[in-house]
From Swiss-Prot:
Residues covered by the 4Fe-4S Wbl-type domain: 19-76
Induction: By sublethal doses of antibiotics such as erythromycin, streptomycin and tetracycline as well as the fatty acids palmitic and oleic acid (in clinical strain 1254). By the antibiotic erythromycin. Positively regulates its own expression (in strain H37Rv).
Consequence of gene loss (knockout): Decreased resistance to macrolides, a lincosamide, and an aminoglycoside antibiotic.
GO biological process: one example: negative regulation of DNA-templated transcription
Organism, scientific name: Mycobacterium tuberculosis (strain ATCC 25618 / H37Rv)
Alphabetical UniProt keywords: 4Fe-4S, Antibiotic resistance, Cytoplasm, Disulfide bond, DNA-binding, Iron, Iron-sulfur, Metal-binding, Transcription, Transcription regulation
Keyword Cell cycle: no
Assigned GO CC terms: cytoplasm
Taxonomic lineage of the native organism: Bacteria, Bacillati, Actinomycetota, Actinomycetes, Mycobacteriales
Record protein name field: Probable transcriptional regulator WhiB7
Name of the encoding gene: whiB7
Amino acid sequence: MSVLTVPRQTPRQRLPVLPCHVGDPDLWFADTPAGLEVAKTLCVSCPIRRQCLAAALQRAEPWGVWGGEIFDQGSIVSHKRPRGRPRKDAVA
């Protein structure tokens, strides 16, 4: 049996705290538009936001908040409408 030793990290070597790694991970896949907006807001200060978005686009993520953007059916949308009846008026 071998033992894996992990060197201690100094404060400068520590990885940054990422918003998606603390709290409720389901927030980034919320069912409600309000929950998704909270996740987007938390992404604003993330140090790897651009890399996260680029990786999500490359992987063709189907849904969730990635890099501060909402993905719905594989496309980036500005906001997600709540479930319910569709609009009565046609969208131009």
